[in-house]
């Protein structure tokens, strides 16, 4: 089967959706499928190469307490038509299909089976509220809908009601199979591990505030922070100015 994985974010820049797409690509190829990743260009990632097809240019912008991407091109329709005619996909798998403008245009012009995975979760979203009114046609072209969690399903169903199958993000267990526990943190103290981008949507500052409350109440739990991002300096300052112990 020939499959196109459509990501609204510039591939392979770091991020949860792109990581999801990467592992899907690798595992689908292991199962004998012919797979392409369809993305935009940005910075050093300018031209199509190998199994990566680039259309338009991606621009980063803040959205929903995180960083999103909007893709623009003066020749979107002709580029997408040429790509679809050339590749002749059996199935297109869209990730966040309503993020402008690459995914909606591909979805509108697709003659393949169209599947979508929804990753996002948030409160009220003006952009999704607007999208629910102008992208009904694109939503109707989806043959299957996946949400990575119950929370993601609840969020997207609010704006695009329909039948969603919850399939959680996979974990590459081989990567951790030979991992050896670090003796440094095997001292009987309870460890709380945070792995993710330091940004409002991930809640790293909320976690630090909760940890501070627990320490005041006598907890000796240790908070381990792994990651980086726009709130890293603020997080370090919070720890230092409040002399917050038990954080590494």
Model-derived regions: residue spans:
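Acidic anion/phosphate-binding donor-loop and adjacent secondary structure
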Residues: 47, 126, 154, 158, ...
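Membrane-proximal helix-turn-helix segments that form the acceptor-binding/catalytic region
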Residues: 128-147, 151-159
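Conserved donor-binding/catalytic core segment of Leloir-type glycosyltransferases
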Residues: 183-212, 224
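N-terminal strand-loop element at the rim of the active site
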Residues: 7-13, 21, 25-74, 82, ...
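Active-site proximal beta-strand in glycosyltransferases
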Residues: 3, 91-93, 98, 103-124, ...
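An amphipathic, basic-hydrophobic alpha-helix
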Residues: 62-91, 101, 130-137
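Carbohydrate-associated surface elements
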Residues: 41, 151, 170
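Nucleotide-activated donor-binding/catalytic signature segment of Leloir-type glycosyltransferases, i.e.
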Residues: 233-248
């Amino acid at each position: 089967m020939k499959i196109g994985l459509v990501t609204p974010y510039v591939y392979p820049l770091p991020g949860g959706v792109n990581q999801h797409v990467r592992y899907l690509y690798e595992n689908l190829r292991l199962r004998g499928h012919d797979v392409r990743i369809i993305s935009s260009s940005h910075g050093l990632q300018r031209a199509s190469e190998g199994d990566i097809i680039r259309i338009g240019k991606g621009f980063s912008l803040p959205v929903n307490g995180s960083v999103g991407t909007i893709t623009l091109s003066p020749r979107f329709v002709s580029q997408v038509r040429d790509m679809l005619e050339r590749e002749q996909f059996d199935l297109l798998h869209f990730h966040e299909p309503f993020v402008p403008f690459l995914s909606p245009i591909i979805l509108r012009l697709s003659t393949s089976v169209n599947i979508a995975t929804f990753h996002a979760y948030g409160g009220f979203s003006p952009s999704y509220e607007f999208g629910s009114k102008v992208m009904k046609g694109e939503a109707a072209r989806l043959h299957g809908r996946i949400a990575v969690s119950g929370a993601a399903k609840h969020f997207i169903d609010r704006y695009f009601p329909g039948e969603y199958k919850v399939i959680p993000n996979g974990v590459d267990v081989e990567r951790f199979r030979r991992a050896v526990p670090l003796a440094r943190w095997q001292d009987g103290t309870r460890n709380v591990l945070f792995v993710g981008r330091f940004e409002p949507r991930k809640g790293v500052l909320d976690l630090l505030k909760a940890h501070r409350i627990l320490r005041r109440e006598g907890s000796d739990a240790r908070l381990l922070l792994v990651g980086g991002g726009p709130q890293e300096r603020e997080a370090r300052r919070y720890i230092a100015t409040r002399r917050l112990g038990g954080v590494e």
